[in-house]
Amino acid sequence: MTDLKASSLRALKLMDLTTLNDDDTDEKVIALCHQTKTPVGNTAAICIYPRFIPIARKTLKEQGTPEIRIATVTNFPHGNDDIEIALAETRAAIAYGADEVDVVFPYRALMAGNEQVGFDLVKACKEACAAANVLLKVIIETGELKDEALIRKASEISIKAGADFIKTSTGKVAVNATPESARIMMEVIRDMGVEKTVGFKPAGGVRTAEDAQKYLAIADELFGADWADARHYRFGASSLLASLLKALGHGDGKSASSY
Protein backbone atom coordinates (compact mmCIF):
# COMPACT_ATOMS: atom_id res chain seq x y z
CA MET A 1 0.00 0.00 0.00
CA THR A 2 1.43 3.39 -0.97
CA ASP A 3 1.87 6.13 1.61
CA LEU A 4 -1.02 8.09 0.09
CA LYS A 5 -3.27 5.02 0.16
CA ALA A 6 -2.36 4.33 3.78
CA SER A 7 -2.97 7.92 4.90
CA SER A 8 -6.20 8.05 2.87
CA LEU A 9 -7.56 4.97 4.62
CA ARG A 10 -6.66 6.49 7.99
CA ALA A 11 -8.28 9.80 7.07
CA LEU A 12 -11.50 8.22 5.82
CA LYS A 13 -12.03 6.49 9.16
CA LEU A 14 -11.44 9.83 10.95
CA MET A 15 -13.93 11.86 8.93
CA ASP A 16 -16.85 13.80 10.33
CA LEU A 17 -18.71 13.75 7.01
CA THR A 18 -20.39 17.13 7.01
CA THR A 19 -23.34 19.00 5.57
CA LEU A 20 -24.10 22.37 7.15
CA ASN A 21 -25.89 24.24 4.39
CA ASP A 22 -28.96 26.47 4.54
CA ASP A 23 -30.67 24.29 1.93
CA ASP A 24 -30.12 20.99 3.76
CA THR A 25 -33.12 18.66 3.67
CA ASP A 26 -34.01 15.25 5.08
CA GLU A 27 -33.17 13.78 1.67
CA LYS A 28 -29.70 15.36 1.62
CA VAL A 29 -28.98 14.11 5.12
CA ILE A 30 -30.17 10.60 4.23
CA ALA A 31 -27.84 10.67 1.21
CA LEU A 32 -25.00 11.82 3.48
CA CYS A 33 -25.67 8.89 5.83
CA HIS A 34 -25.48 6.50 2.88
CA GLN A 35 -22.08 7.96 1.94
CA THR A 36 -20.61 7.17 5.38
CA LYS A 37 -20.61 3.47 4.51
CA THR A 38 -17.88 2.88 1.93
CA PRO A 39 -16.25 -0.20 0.35
CA VAL A 40 -13.12 0.43 2.45
CA GLY A 41 -14.72 1.26 5.80
CA ASN A 42 -16.99 3.76 7.52
CA THR A 43 -16.43 7.38 8.44
CA ALA A 44 -16.19 8.14 12.17
CA ALA A 45 -19.21 10.43 12.23
CA ILE A 46 -21.51 12.74 10.37
CA CYS A 47 -21.90 16.42 11.24
CA ILE A 48 -25.32 17.97 10.61
CA TYR A 49 -27.70 20.60 11.95
CA PRO A 50 -29.59 19.50 15.10
CA ARG A 51 -33.02 19.20 13.49
CA PHE A 52 -31.76 16.39 11.24
CA ILE A 53 -30.43 14.20 14.06
CA PRO A 54 -33.55 11.97 14.35
CA ILE A 55 -33.66 11.14 10.61
CA ALA A 56 -29.90 10.54 10.60
CA ARG A 57 -30.14 8.21 13.60
CA LYS A 58 -32.90 6.23 11.89
CA THR A 59 -30.98 6.02 8.58
CA LEU A 60 -27.69 4.96 10.17
CA LYS A 61 -29.49 2.25 12.12
CA GLU A 62 -31.39 1.00 9.06
CA GLN A 63 -28.22 0.72 6.98
CA GLY A 64 -26.51 -1.32 9.70
CA THR A 65 -24.06 1.34 10.91
CA PRO A 66 -25.50 2.51 14.25
CA GLU A 67 -21.95 2.97 15.58
CA ILE A 68 -21.32 5.95 13.29
CA ARG A 69 -21.51 8.94 15.58
CA ILE A 70 -23.71 11.99 15.07
CA ALA A 71 -22.12 15.38 15.63
CA THR A 72 -23.94 18.69 15.45
CA VAL A 73 -23.19 22.40 15.85
CA THR A 74 -24.23 25.07 18.34
CA ASN A 75 -23.55 28.80 18.68
CA PHE A 76 -22.94 28.38 14.96
CA PRO A 77 -21.48 29.91 12.91
CA HIS A 78 -21.31 33.35 14.50
CA GLY A 79 -19.64 32.50 17.81
CA ASN A 80 -21.60 35.09 19.76
CA ASP A 81 -20.85 35.62 23.44
CA ASP A 82 -24.35 34.91 24.83
CA ILE A 83 -23.71 31.99 27.15
CA GLU A 84 -27.40 31.30 27.83
CA ILE A 85 -28.18 30.90 24.12
CA ALA A 86 -25.13 28.71 23.48
CA LEU A 87 -26.05 26.54 26.45
CA ALA A 88 -29.73 26.30 25.43
CA GLU A 89 -28.72 25.26 21.90
CA THR A 90 -26.29 22.69 23.30
CA ARG A 91 -28.94 21.23 25.61
CA ALA A 92 -31.38 21.08 22.68
CA ALA A 93 -28.77 19.27 20.56
CA ILE A 94 -28.28 16.73 23.34
CA ALA A 95 -32.06 16.28 23.62
CA TYR A 96 -32.21 15.59 19.86
CA GLY A 97 -29.73 12.77 20.45
CA ALA A 98 -26.34 14.18 19.44
CA ASP A 99 -23.29 12.08 20.32
CA GLU A 100 -21.00 15.08 19.87
CA VAL A 101 -21.49 18.85 19.92
CA ASP A 102 -19.24 21.26 18.01
CA VAL A 103 -19.72 24.65 19.69
CA VAL A 104 -18.30 27.90 18.34
CA PHE A 105 -16.03 29.75 20.77
CA PRO A 106 -16.84 33.47 21.19
CA TYR A 107 -13.77 34.40 19.18
CA ARG A 108 -14.69 38.03 18.56
CA ALA A 109 -14.96 38.62 22.30
CA LEU A 110 -11.45 37.20 22.69
CA MET A 111 -10.17 39.48 19.91
CA ALA A 112 -11.66 42.39 21.86
CA GLY A 113 -9.74 41.32 24.98
CA ASN A 114 -12.36 39.30 26.86
CA GLU A 115 -10.91 35.91 27.85
CA GLN A 116 -13.47 35.12 30.55
CA VAL A 117 -16.61 34.76 28.45
CA GLY A 118 -15.01 32.10 26.27
CA PHE A 119 -13.99 30.09 29.30
CA ASP A 120 -17.43 30.42 30.89
CA LEU A 121 -19.27 29.51 27.67
CA VAL A 122 -17.20 26.40 27.02
CA LYS A 123 -17.40 25.34 30.68
CA ALA A 124 -21.21 25.63 30.70
CA CYS A 125 -21.54 23.63 27.49
CA LYS A 126 -19.06 21.04 28.76
CA GLU A 127 -21.07 20.50 31.95
CA ALA A 128 -24.21 19.84 29.88
CA CYS A 129 -22.32 17.49 27.54
CA ALA A 130 -20.50 15.61 30.30
CA ALA A 131 -23.77 14.88 32.09
CA ALA A 132 -25.07 13.22 28.91
CA ASN A 133 -21.79 11.50 27.94
CA VAL A 134 -21.56 13.71 24.84
CA LEU A 135 -18.20 14.82 23.40
CA LEU A 136 -17.61 18.57 23.17
CA LYS A 137 -15.57 20.01 20.32
CA VAL A 138 -14.78 23.73 20.43
CA ILE A 139 -14.44 25.65 17.15
CA ILE A 140 -12.06 28.57 17.63
CA GLU A 141 -12.28 30.02 14.07
CA THR A 142 -8.55 30.32 13.38
CA GLY A 143 -9.06 32.12 10.07
CA GLU A 144 -10.67 35.04 11.90
CA LEU A 145 -8.31 35.02 14.89
CA LYS A 146 -5.38 34.99 12.41
CA ASP A 147 -2.76 35.88 15.05
CA GLU A 148 -0.72 32.96 16.43
CA ALA A 149 -0.98 34.28 19.99
CA LEU A 150 -4.79 34.47 19.73
CA ILE A 151 -5.04 30.97 18.21
CA ARG A 152 -2.89 29.68 21.05
CA LYS A 153 -4.92 31.57 23.68
CA ALA A 154 -8.30 30.36 22.35
CA SER A 155 -6.98 26.78 22.31
CA GLU A 156 -5.69 27.07 25.88
CA ILE A 157 -8.91 28.60 27.20
CA SER A 158 -11.03 25.94 25.50
CA ILE A 159 -8.92 23.12 26.91
CA LYS A 160 -8.90 24.59 30.44
CA ALA A 161 -12.70 24.90 30.26
CA GLY A 162 -13.07 21.21 29.38
CA ALA A 163 -13.00 20.82 25.58
CA ASP A 164 -12.67 17.21 24.43
CA PHE A 165 -11.49 18.46 21.03
CA ILE A 166 -10.33 21.77 19.63
CA LYS A 167 -11.43 22.46 16.05
CA THR A 168 -10.08 25.01 13.62
CA SER A 169 -13.08 26.38 11.79
CA THR A 170 -16.77 26.59 10.99
CA GLY A 171 -16.14 26.37 7.26
CA LYS A 172 -18.26 29.52 6.95
CA VAL A 173 -15.53 32.19 6.80
CA ALA A 174 -12.96 33.14 4.15
CA VAL A 175 -10.05 31.21 5.68
CA ASN A 176 -10.66 27.84 7.30
CA ALA A 177 -8.22 25.08 8.31
CA THR A 178 -4.57 25.60 7.36
CA PRO A 179 -1.57 23.40 8.20
CA GLU A 180 -0.07 26.38 10.06
CA SER A 181 -3.03 26.83 12.40
CA ALA A 182 -3.28 23.05 12.84
CA ARG A 183 0.31 22.89 14.02
CA ILE A 184 -0.20 25.74 16.50
CA MET A 185 -3.29 24.06 17.98
CA MET A 186 -1.68 20.63 18.25
CA GLU A 187 1.41 22.21 19.83
CA VAL A 188 -0.88 23.65 22.52
CA ILE A 189 -2.26 20.16 23.18
CA ARG A 190 1.32 18.88 23.45
CA ASP A 191 2.60 21.79 25.55
CA MET A 192 -0.29 21.48 28.02
CA GLY A 193 0.33 17.72 28.29
CA VAL A 194 -3.30 16.86 27.50
CA GLU A 195 -2.85 14.67 24.42
CA LYS A 196 -4.44 11.70 26.19
CA THR A 197 -7.72 13.54 26.73
CA VAL A 198 -7.92 16.30 24.09
CA GLY A 199 -8.22 15.77 20.35
CA PHE A 200 -7.88 17.97 17.27
CA LYS A 201 -10.16 18.58 14.28
CA PRO A 202 -9.23 20.55 11.17
CA ALA A 203 -12.36 21.61 9.28
CA GLY A 204 -13.14 23.45 6.10
CA GLY A 205 -10.70 23.49 3.21
CA VAL A 206 -9.35 19.94 3.69
CA ARG A 207 -10.37 18.74 0.25
CA THR A 208 -7.85 16.26 -1.15
CA ALA A 209 -6.16 13.05 -0.09
CA GLU A 210 -2.88 14.99 -0.23
CA ASP A 211 -4.29 17.66 2.13
CA ALA A 212 -5.33 14.98 4.63
CA GLN A 213 -1.91 13.36 4.41
CA LYS A 214 -0.26 16.70 5.32
CA TYR A 215 -2.45 17.17 8.40
CA LEU A 216 -1.90 13.62 9.61
CA ALA A 217 1.86 14.02 9.17
CA ILE A 218 1.84 16.96 11.62
CA ALA A 219 -0.01 14.84 14.20
CA ASP A 220 2.39 11.93 13.69
CA GLU A 221 5.39 14.23 14.07
CA LEU A 222 4.11 15.75 17.33
CA PHE A 223 2.51 12.71 18.99
CA GLY A 224 3.69 9.56 17.19
CA ALA A 225 1.87 7.44 14.63
CA ASP A 226 -0.66 5.91 17.04
CA TRP A 227 -2.19 9.09 18.46
CA ALA A 228 -4.51 10.12 15.63
CA ASP A 229 -7.39 7.72 16.28
CA ALA A 230 -11.09 8.61 16.26
CA ARG A 231 -10.98 9.77 19.89
CA HIS A 232 -8.13 12.20 19.19
CA TYR A 233 -8.46 13.24 15.56
CA ARG A 234 -11.24 14.08 13.11
CA PHE A 235 -11.48 15.75 9.73
CA GLY A 236 -14.49 18.03 9.26
CA ALA A 237 -15.13 17.72 5.54
CA SER A 238 -17.41 16.48 2.80
CA SER A 239 -15.70 16.86 -0.58
CA LEU A 240 -12.64 15.13 0.93
CA LEU A 241 -14.42 11.76 0.92
CA ALA A 242 -14.50 11.48 -2.89
CA SER A 243 -10.79 12.29 -3.11
CA LEU A 244 -9.90 9.70 -0.45
CA LEU A 245 -11.99 7.04 -2.19
CA LYS A 246 -10.31 7.84 -5.51
CA ALA A 247 -6.87 7.48 -3.89
CA LEU A 248 -8.05 4.10 -2.59
CA GLY A 249 -9.17 2.98 -6.05
CA HIS A 250 -12.90 3.70 -5.72
CA GLY A 251 -14.80 6.34 -7.69
CA ASP A 252 -13.67 9.27 -9.80
CA GLY A 253 -12.84 11.77 -7.06
CA LYS A 254 -15.72 14.08 -7.93
CA SER A 255 -17.87 15.59 -5.21
CA ALA A 256 -20.89 17.84 -5.27
CA SER A 257 -19.85 19.55 -2.07
CA SER A 258 -17.47 22.38 -1.25
CA TYR A 259 -16.97 22.01 2.53
Curated annotation (Swiss-Prot):
Subcellular localization: Cytoplasm
Pathway: Carbohydrate degradation; 2-deoxy-D-ribose 1-phosphate degradation; D-glyceraldehyde 3-phosphate and acetaldehyde from 2-deoxy-alpha-D-ribose 1-phosphate: step 2/2
GO molecular function: deoxyribose-phosphate aldolase activity
Top-level taxon in the UniProt lineage: Bacteria
One cellular-component annotation, GO: cytoplasm
Keywords assigned: Cytoplasm, Lyase, Schiff base
Reactions that this protein is recorded to catalyse: 2-deoxy-D-ribose 5-phosphate = D-glyceraldehyde 3-phosphate + acetaldehyde
InterPro entries in alphabetical order: Aldolase_TIM, DeoC, DeoC/FbaB/LacD_aldolase, DeoC_typeII
EC number: 4.1.2.4
Active site positions, chain numbering: D102, K167, K201
Name of a matching Pfam family: DeoC
First-listed, main subcellular location of the protein, grouped into a coarse class: cytoplasm
BP term (GO), one: deoxyribonucleotide catabolic process
Function: Catalyzes a reversible aldol reaction between acetaldehyde and D-glyceraldehyde 3-phosphate to generate 2-deoxy-D-ribose 5-phosphate.
Family: Belongs to the DeoC/FbaB aldolase family. DeoC type 2 subfamily.
Name this protein carries in UniProt: Deoxyribose-phosphate aldolase
Organism encoding this protein: Shigella boydii serotype 18 (strain CDC 3083-94 / BS512)
Organism placement in taxonomy: Bacteria, Pseudomonadati, Pseudomonadota, Gammaproteobacteria, Enterobacterales
